[in-house]
Amino acid sequence: MASTAIENAEPSDCKADLKIPKIDGDFPLKVLYCGVCSLPTEYCEYMPDVAKCRQWLEKNFPDVFAKLTLGHIPKQETGTVEGQATSGEEEEKKKQKRGGRGQIKQKKKTVPQRITIAKIPRAKKKYVTRVCGLATFEIELKDAQRFFAQKFSCGASVTGEDEIIIQGDFTDDIIDVIQEKWPEVDDDSIEDLGEVKK
């Protein structure tokens, strides 16, 4: 009798909704993880090395690979030529999909490794020393700025992309200090420009 009351009642009258979940698969679910990126295979397309993931999946699990690639086939027309299909793939590679990291690019060292030291006049008889080019030797500018401030007991700041300003005239001592602290910097790569106007 209780079951007939629930069946006849309005949905707004029921305080407890009886929802029966639909069972589409076996529980617990078995998730297939990629051997290249270690993510579930559905997420491989968002990684920067999609081609490697697809090759691994095609080699190890061809049936799963066929299911995943079926979603991409309807984009192409049935009467396409092979040359047209490859140009479409190239366009897809050029465009970065939202949410993906894209291809990781390596930095190219095109700038010559050279450190320049200059003495810049300020008001009256005061000077600042400008050191440029430490970043070309992969030296952290913030660490170098702290080191110069402690070594010379003065103020120092990182002002530009590759520039440190030290308050005071330290052009004579700074070459030896740089070579002492960072031995990868040789004497030929340090250039003293002398007194330069700002």
UniProtKB/Swiss-Prot annotation:
<dbReference type="GO" id="GO:0002188">
    <property type="term" value="P:translation reinitiation"/>
</dbReference>
<dbReference type="GO" id="GO:0003729">
    <property type="term" value="F:mRNA binding"/>
</dbReference>
<feature type="region of interest" description="Disordered">
    <location>
        <begin position="76"/>
        <end position="110"/>
    </location>
</feature>
<keyword id="KW-0396">Initiation factor</keyword>
<dbReference type="InterPro" id="IPR001950">
    <property type="entry name" value="SUI1"/>
</dbReference>
<dbReference type="GO" id="GO:0003743">
    <property type="term" value="F:translation initiation factor activity"/>
</dbReference>
<comment type="function">
    <text>May be involved in the translation of target mRNAs by scanning and recognition of the initiation codon. Involved in translation initiation; promotes recruitment of aminoacetyled initiator tRNA to P site of 40S ribosomes. Can promote release of deacylated tRNA and mRNA from recycled 40S subunits following ABCE1-mediated dissociation of post-termination ribosomal complexes into subunits.</text>
</comment>
<dbReference type="InterPro" id="IPR046447">
    <property type="entry name" value="DENR_C"/>
</dbReference>
<keyword id="KW-0648">Protein biosynthesis</keyword>
<dbReference type="InterPro" id="IPR036877">
    <property type="entry name" value="SUI1_dom_sf"/>
</dbReference>
<protein>
    <recommendedName>
        <fullName>Density-regulated protein</fullName>
    </recommendedName>
</protein>
<dbReference type="InterPro" id="IPR005873">
    <property type="entry name" value="DENR_eukaryotes"/>
</dbReference>
<feature type="compositionally biased region" description="Basic residues">
    <location>
        <begin position="95"/>
        <end position="110"/>
    </location>
</feature>
<dbReference type="Pfam" id="PF21023">
    <property type="entry name" value="DENR_N"/>
</dbReference>
<comment type="similarity">
    <text>Belongs to the DENR family.</text>
</comment>
<dbReference type="GO" id="GO:0001731">
    <property type="term" value="P:formation of translation preinitiation complex"/>
</dbReference>
<dbReference type="Pfam" id="PF01253">
    <property type="entry name" value="SUI1"/>
</dbReference>
<feature type="compositionally biased region" description="Polar residues">
    <location>
        <begin position="77"/>
        <end position="87"/>
    </location>
</feature>
<dbReference type="InterPro" id="IPR048517">
    <property type="entry name" value="DENR_N"/>
</dbReference>
<feature type="domain" description="SUI1">
    <location>
        <begin position="115"/>
        <end position="182"/>
    </location>
</feature>
<dbReference type="InterPro" id="IPR050318">
    <property type="entry name" value="DENR/SUI1_TIF"/>
</dbReference>
